[in-house]
Amino acid sequence: MLTVEFTIEPFVEGDPGAHVTAAVAAVEAHGIAVDFGPFGSLFSVNEKSLPIVIGDLLRVAYENGATFVNIAVSRFNS
């Protein structure tokens, strides 16, 4: 499994905005739980699904007004 951490700008204090909530919903539509946080969010995904899920996250974020998306993907061996 891979861990994906992401932030989406612009930051809107007190309300994450559609550019964030729609992107989170796009990930959740794949049956993936998102740990939503004020300074970044994360989820776990398998390697096969990674490009599809990331693609949907980016597409929906920018369709809804994102100006910048930062994504970090990590593999943690147990």
Model-based region annotation:
Residues M1-S78:
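Charge-rich, low-complexity N-terminal segments
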